[in-house]
């Protein structure tokens, strides 16, 4: 008798960026050529709301349903990106270069609604995060071993004030596949936010 194995998917929920914002952020990657870092591909730049890990098909369908419901009751809003810096904050040695955004009330309401809805479902494996969260984009991941070889006073300063804004009109259910050339992301479902009335 054949045994069928449910597919496992590496899933996260994200805010994807408009092309012009991706291009402007990718342009900053050439500003620090001396930095030992793996830069994020332009097409992969995004803001992660929640990383959900590996899910089977049934769990994925439930996550999709929840995400659509949450999106439909939260209105469009804007995000302002204001700084490029090492991240996470206070982490030594730094692990990444981040683009940080302002934490608006609309962003907080959306993320809290999503977290609450996922946590109260008995059909998906989800644990709320007990840490403060602000919107950020991983611009690149630092090669730690190479970073440690650089004398502290010679390590490049990454602390750039920027001013980029964009409107968020949807959130996306994303699948990440780990390939030899790096992660490949696929949008599984686009969940539109509620239009302003």
Each language-model region and where it sits:
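Histidine-dependent nucleotide/RNA phosphoesterase domain, centered on the 2H-phosphoesterase fold
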Residues: 2-197
């Amino acid at each position: 008798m054949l045994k069928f194995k449910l597919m496992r998917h590496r899933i996260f929920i994200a805010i994807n960026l408009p092309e012009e914002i991706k291009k402007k952020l990718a342009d900053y990657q050439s500003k620090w050529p001396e930095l030992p870092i793996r830069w994020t591909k332009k097409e992969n730049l995004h803001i992660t709301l929640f990383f959900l890990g590996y899910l089977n098909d049934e769990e994925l369908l439930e996550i999709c349903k929840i995400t659509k419901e949450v999106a439909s009751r939260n209105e469009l809003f804007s995000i302002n990106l204001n700084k490029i810096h090492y991240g996470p904050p206070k982490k030594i040695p730094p692990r990444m270069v981040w683009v940080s955004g302002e934490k608006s009330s609309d962003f907080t309401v959306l993320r809290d609604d999503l977290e609450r809805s996922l946590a109260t479902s008995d059909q998906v494996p989800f644990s709320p995060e007990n840490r403060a969260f602000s919107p950020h984009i991983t611009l690149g991941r630092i090669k730690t071993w190479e970073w440690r070889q650089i004398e502290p006073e010679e390590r490049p300063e990454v602390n750039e004030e920027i001013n980029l804004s964009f409107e968020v009109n949807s959130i996306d259910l994303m699948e990440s596949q780990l390939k030899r050339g790096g992660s490949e992301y696929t949008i599984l479902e686009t969940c539109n936010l509620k239009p302003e009335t």
